[in-house]
C-alpha cells in the first residue's frame, strides 16, 4: 500500500511532527507502532528540562528513521521579495507574519 500525504508543522517544536507516530494519534495514518517510541514521546511531552526533552525526541526520531513508516519526498519552501521600504517584516520558521507590525519608510 502507498499513500501520499502532507503535514505542515502547527508550532515550532519537534513534537508537531514526532507525535504523528504515536500509536493512537488520529493522524497516524500508517498505523505504525513501536513499543519504545510512544513512551519516549510521552516522556518528552512531560519533561520541563529542554536538554532532556531534546534527547528523548532524538532517541524517538532514531527509532522512527530506522523503521521508516513514512518516506519524506519533499518539503515546502517559500520565497518572498520584500521591498526595502517595508519595515517590521521578518522571516518565520512557521511562515506566519504579523502584518499589523509592517510599516513603510
Model-derived regions, located:
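Bilobed periplasmic-binding protein-like "clamshell/Venus-flytrap" ligand-binding domains
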Residues: 3-6, 48-84
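Selective for proline/serine-rich intrinsically disordered segments
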Residues: 12, 67-70, 89, 96
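Extracytoplasmic/secreted proteins, especially bacterial periplasmic and envelope-associated proteins
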Residues: 13, 36-43, 52-59, 63
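Periplasmic binding protein-like
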Residues: 1-24, 56
Amino acid at each position: 500500500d502507498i499513500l501520499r500525504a502532507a503535514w505542515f508543522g502547527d508550532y515550532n517544536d519537534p513534537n508537531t511532527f514526532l507525535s504523528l507516530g504515536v500509536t493512537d494519534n488520529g493522524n497516524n495514518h500508517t498505523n505504525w507502532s513501536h513499543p519504545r517510541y510512544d513512551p519516549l514521546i510521552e516522556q518528552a511531552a512531560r519533561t520541563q528540562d529542554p536538554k532532556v526533552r531534546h534527547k528523548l525526541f532524538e532517541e524517538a526520531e532514531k527509532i522512527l528513521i530506522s523503521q521508516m513508516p513514512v518516506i519524506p519526498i519533499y518539503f515546502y519552501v517559500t520565497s518572498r521579495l520584500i521591498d526595502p521600504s517595508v519595515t517590521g517584516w521578518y522571516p518565520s520558521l512557521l511562515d506566519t507574519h504579523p502584518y499589523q507590525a509592517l510599516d513603510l519608510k
